[in-house]
């Protein structure tokens, strides 16, 4: 049988958002989530005799559902059940797959009914997933697929989660495998959980070239041999062609589906017929079955559990205002970290999902405000290193039209508000108009000017402790205390067990033009 068309459907960075909601409130309905995205795929694929369904990683962590599974079962089985019944053909690993530790990940991989491909992460002498490249026969055509993951994971992940692993360059791994893939396959698909370090049209760098994203380098060197180049990690929406290669990145949380159709002529020459993003929109034929509704109800009930009542409202109405000046919520976050750690200084980012706390605080509020499974470390740093850290945070700001605004470096190609930290226990002033590295002044701890040669302690999350977000000054800092409590649980414990009637002001900073 001669194949004429093959359709490839891709989701990426779903982050455990199965249901059509982001859980910010109960019983809401939004055009998102794996169930609805899968419905879009199934409706569309009917027109093709041959098709593939692909998950491009970051499926295991990131939503309240994932938090719920960890808290109640310690197993990803319910999440796996959703993926298994949707009949994915293959997937790859994302960087967040490691957040709950290697045993949890390996257990999940054993339960999945489709291959998860990753050719550039090794455990001992073999690839972690035991499968880096796989071939699929479609009619008289062979489709070769390689899975690759960003090599930058050691810069973010807790060392104990990855201590037996080695991470290799995606570029070098692809270069190594392509010759053999070309010998065995008529169609080559690269499934890369990583993104682009340069603009696809101009080739101009869009970020510091750290090796985190190698997509442009791979396309520039190997596009003539690649039919489909699937990407993720940056949560961007991309559907275009790079020379003759289809390039896809389908956003996050199941809000869009990447679709590529390849066609072959009578001489078996392969070409890209279409490359697009399918919007995930409401459909009257979409329903959620009774068993799934029951799972969602259990989750919603858990999220609505009331933890405590605060003395006053800490709602964030405007995120930028809460980043440019002290806010009751970021003050509370830093106070909790200072109390838990005993450090001189603490710092926290205000995450994209954060809305602060109303007076009555529920589990939903805590998880929406601290969605990542970060633990914490107390590091010993010099006053000079502390200043370096605050200077890095000060790079978040820029002056546009004579107003303080967010620097483009923290907005493109992917918003990185999580790489701006707000500090507690130290007062400081940021002068945005000054050159980078010279913006911070008036640093005071407990009423005394910060001595650049003196040693202080700072409580940071594990992502920062290994230099995540270009906070390299922390990488070799001695660890004074390791706090193996995740952010959400730390807040739950603090809210449950402390007198909150008087919360001291620990955040004190100014941002000036």
Go through each PLM region and give its residues:
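Feature captures C-terminal
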Residues: 5-7, 17, 30-32, 36, ...
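A general secondary-structure junction signal
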Residues: 55-57, 349-351, 432
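A short C-terminal boundary segment appended to hydrolase-like catalytic domains
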Residues: 264-362, 466, 495-513
């Amino acid at each position: 049988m001669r194949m004429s068309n093959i359709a490839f459907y891709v989701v990426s960075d779903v982050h455990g958002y199965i249901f059509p909601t982001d859980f910010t409130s109960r019983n809401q309905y939004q055009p998102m989530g794996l169930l609805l995205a899968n419905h879009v795929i199934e409706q569309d694929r009917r027109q093709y005799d041959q098709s593939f369904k692909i998950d491009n990683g970051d499926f295991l962590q990131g939503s309240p559902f994932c938090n719920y599974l960890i808290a109640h079962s310690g197993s990803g089985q319910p999440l796996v059940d959703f993926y298994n019944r949707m009949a994915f053909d293959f997937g790859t690993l994302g960087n967040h797959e490691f957040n709950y530790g290697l045993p949890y990940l390996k257990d999940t991989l054993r339960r999945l009914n489709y291959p998860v491909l990753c050719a550039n992460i090794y455990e001992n002498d073999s690839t972690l997933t035991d499968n880096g490249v796989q071939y699929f026969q479609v009619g008289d055509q062979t489709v070769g697929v390689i899975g690759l993951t960003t090599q930058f994971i050691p810069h973010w992940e807790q060392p104990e989660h990855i201590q037996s692993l080695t991470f290799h360059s995606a570029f070098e791994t692809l270069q190594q495998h392509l010759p053999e893939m070309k010998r065995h396959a008529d169609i080559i698909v690269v499934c890369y959980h990583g993104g682009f370090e340069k603009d696809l049209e101009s080739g101009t760098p869009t970020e510091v070239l750290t090796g985190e994203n190698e997509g442009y380098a791979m396309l520039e060197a190997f596009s003539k041999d690649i039919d489909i180049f699937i990407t993720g990690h940056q949560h961007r929406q991309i559907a275009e062609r790079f020379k003759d290669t289809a390039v896809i990145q389908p956003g996050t949380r199941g809000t869009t589906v990447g679709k590529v159709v390849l066609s072959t002529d009578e001489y078996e020459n392969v070409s890209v017929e279409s490359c697009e993003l399918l919007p995930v929109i409401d459909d009257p034929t979409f329903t959620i079955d009774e068993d799934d509704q029951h799972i969602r109800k259990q989750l919603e009930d858990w999220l609505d559990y009331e933890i405590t009542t605060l003395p006053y409202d800490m709602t964030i109405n405007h995120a930028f205002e809460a980043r440019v000046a002290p806010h009751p919520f970021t003050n509370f976050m830093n106070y909790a970290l200072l109390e838990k750690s005993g450090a001189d200084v603490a710092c926290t980012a205000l995450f994209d999902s954060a809305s602060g706390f109303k007076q009555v605080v529920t589990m939903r509020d805590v998880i929406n405000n601290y969605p990542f499974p970060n633990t914490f470390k107390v590091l010993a740093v010099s006053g000079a290193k502390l200043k370096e850290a605050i200077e890095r945070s000060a790079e978040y700001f820029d002056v546009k039209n004579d107003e303080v605004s967010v620097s483009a470096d923290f907005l493109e190609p992917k918003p990185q508000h999580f790489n701006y930290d707000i500090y507690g226990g130290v007062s400081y002033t940021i002068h945005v108009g000054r050159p980078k590295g010279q913006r911070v002044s008036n640093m005071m701890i407990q009423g005394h000017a910060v001595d650049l040669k003196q040693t202080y302690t700072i409580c940071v999350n594990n992502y920062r402790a290994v230099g995540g977000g270009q906070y390299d000054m922390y990488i070799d800092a001695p660890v004074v205390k390791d706090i193996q409590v995740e952010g959400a649980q730390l807040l739950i414990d603090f809210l449950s067990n402390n007198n909150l009637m008087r919360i001291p002001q620990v955040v004190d900073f100014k941002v000036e033009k």
